[in-house]
Regions:
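Signature of multi-pass transmembrane helix bundles
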Residues: 1-39, 59-263
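Loop-helix junctions at membrane interfaces
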Residues: 9, 13, 18, 24, ...
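Juxtamembrane "helix exit" motif at the C-terminal ends of alpha-helical transmembrane segments
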Residues: 40-56, 220-225, 285
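The feature identifies polytopic integral membrane transport proteins across all domains of life
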Residues: 107-111, 268-273, 299-302, 327
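Central hydrophobic cores of alpha-helical transmembrane segments
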Residues: 112-120, 272-281
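Transmembrane alpha-helix interface/packing and boundary motifs in multi-pass membrane proteins
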Residues: 256-270, 320-321
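Transmembrane helix boundary and interhelical junction motifs in multipass membrane proteins
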Residues: 265-274, 309-313
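Helix-loop-helix junctions within the multi-pass membrane cores of secondary transporters/permeases
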Residues: 278-327
Length: 327
């Protein structure tokens, strides 16, 4: 056993500690924590919608009372879980900008960084196709969803939900890097000393915003030539990763890695779950709302693996409560 711990400490801890200390990883971890309240709020109203399945004997009662107002209160689910990519993008860009501001002593505004990240993400929402006749906004009609003026619509803007989380993170990091580069190299509009700080920061973001706009137009245009976009380009590899992590073998490997890190003094939950797994869980949860049956989604981990703490320590806690004695 000592050989195992020695191997983990010497071979596994150093690279994982380096990964955990990467600035964008730290920003994603913080973004994952800050978005938790929105998933909880959305889940509460989602449970209300499923009361007939939870308590079948009272199904007719719920249908005649609470569920009559479902279109009203379901807005809370749509605007929380259904918009989770927006929150992830804003939070990631905000915290990453804040990290650069503090660690590199740059004159950055975390709020401006968040807005630039959101701007970059929104530019990936519209679907455009380029042919011999030029560029056109996609228009399609399906049974469950449509694309109107380039925007995929279900009950809400589809790409604002879990399916857009990774693009939201990617564009947040990209926009923050552009903002940081412009400020670091002084490629900004400098205002006189007497101008209020808020106005000065607003004009300082103008050139980064222009660069981000041209950059996203270039990326969208290049991909539209091949009849795809960022979401379409990354959907296949991400779907493979989601399916892999959602398998029983994937779950076992992930949880084993988390607890091995705990065993050698590294916060395994923060390094593995909060940074990499939470976005995947949110995507799976969003799919479940639409009728999918992903097991590894939402609070599955907390209910069946982390109950009482990492390692399902509820039994140990109860044992300590009733059997432990003070020395």
């Amino acid at each position: 056993m000592n050989h195992v711990f020695t191997f983990l400490e010497q071979r596994l801890m150093p690279p994982l500690n380096k990964v955990a200390n990467l600035r964008f990883i730290r920003a994603i971890m913080q973004a994952g924590v800050i978005t938790v309240p929105f998933t909880i709020v959305g889940s509460i109203f989602l449970i209300i919608n499923n009361l007939p399945q939870i308590i079948p004997p009272l199904a007719s009662f719920f249908e005649q009372t609470i569920l009559k107002f479902s279109p009203l209160y379901s807005v809370a689910t749509t605007m929380s879980i259904g918009s989770i990519a927006l929150f992830y993008c804003l939070a990631t860009a905000y915290y990453l900008t804040d990290i650069y501001r503090k660690e590199e002593k740059l004159q950055l505004s975390s709020f401006v960084g968040a807005i630039l990240g959101l701007f970059a993400f929104l530019m990936t929402i519209i679907q455009v196709d380029i042919s011999d006749s030029g560029a056109q906004l996609l228009q399609t009609t399906g049974e469950t969803a449509i694309i109107y003026n380039g925007v995929a619509l279900g009950s809400w803007v589809t790409r604002f939900s879990g399916v857009g989380i990774f693009i939201g993170i990617l564009t947040a990091v990209l926009a923050t890097q552009v903002y940081r580069f412009c400020v670091k190299k002084k490629i900004t509009i400098q205002m006189p000393a007497g101008v209020p700080d808020g106005v000065s920061k607003a004009f300082a973001s103008l050139i980064p915003a222009i660069i981000i706009a041209f950059l996203m137009i270039l990326i969208n245009g290049c991909l539209a030539v091949f009849h795809t976009d960022l979401h379409g380009l990354l959907s296949k590899p991400f779907e493979f990763v989601k399916d892999l992590t959602g398998s029983w073998l994937g779950i076992i490997v992930i949880m084993l890695l988390i607890h091995l890190l705990w065993a050698v003094g590294v916060h395994g939950t923060a390094v593995i779950k909060n940074s990499f797994i939470n976005p995947i869980l949110l995507v799976a949860l969003t799919e479940n709302i639409d009728g999918a049956t992903n097991i590894f989604a939402g609070d599955f981990v907390n209910m069946y693996i982390f109950i009482g703490g990492a390692g399902s320590t509820l039994g140990l806690v109860l044992l300590m409560l009733f059997r432990a004695k003070s020395q």
